Design a protein with these regions (language model features):
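Active-site and NAD+-binding cores of ADP-ribose-processing enzymes
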Residues: 1-26, 34-37, 44-199
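Active-site rim elements
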Residues: 30
């Protein structure tokens, strides 16, 4: 599966030592990727920093999504994933936790750390446990869509996706490009003709 990542830093491989520094961990601990190139360009500029001198667009590949290798933030957790996690933790997940991928991630993290709030440490702990039982990703639509009871889940999943990859070893860089960006209508966009591949 081909996706994109934007960053002000040039690197040869992904690692999670700086996880959360660019966009935070709202959608879990991991390498944040998107199917939408424009979105990666926008996020090549960290929102909390002054305009950085360099910006890079990464084209990457990850193993394909399968029904039991990812969570979807706003959808119920597949039963095989629930079973593997419950077995690893030695306890049953509450019904509320399995109703949405986000709640499940947070429950795992709080269970592992013994806390009542889900923050950075809890998201990291959840990502490590999920990766250890074959759950590689957290997925959410690029354009946020409210999930309703009568929603067509297949149509929801056909929308362009963002993905948090829990283990950086699952991300392979295919191409790196130095890009220039400019701010248009509060969005960072690619300056036409500025792409230059980096070897």
């Amino acid at each position: 599966m081909q996706l994109y990542h934007g960053s002000p830093s040039l690197f040869d491989r992904f690692d999670l030592s700086g996880a959360g520094e660019g966009t935070g961990i709202k959608y879990g601990f991991g390498v944040y990727l998107t199917e939408v190139e424009k979105s990666a360009v926008h996020y090549s500029q960290p929102r909390h920093l002054e305009l950085q001198p360099d910006h890079y667009l990464y084209t990457v590949e990850i193993p394909d999504l399968t029904p039991d290798n990812h969570l979807v933030s706003a959808l119920p957790v597949p039963a095989p994933i629930v079973s593997r996690v419950e077995e690893r933790l030695g306890q049953k997940a509450p019904d509320k936790a399995v109703a949405k991928g986000k709640e499940f991630r947070q429950w795992i993290g709080m269970t592992l750390t013994g806390t009542k709030d889900a923050g950075f440490a809890e998201e990291k702990a959840a990502a490590e446990l999920l990766d250890s039982v074959g759950v590689l990703y957290n997925v959410w639509p690029n354009a946020q869509v409210k999930v309703t009871a009568d929603m067509d889940v297949e149509a929801y999943m056909r929308k362009p996706k963002n993905i948090a990859v829990f283990n950086a070893d699952n991300v392979r860089i295919v191409k790196r490009e130095h890009i220039e960006i400019e701010n248009k209508y509060k969005k960072w966009v690619l300056v036409e003709g500025s792409r230059r591949e980096v070897q």
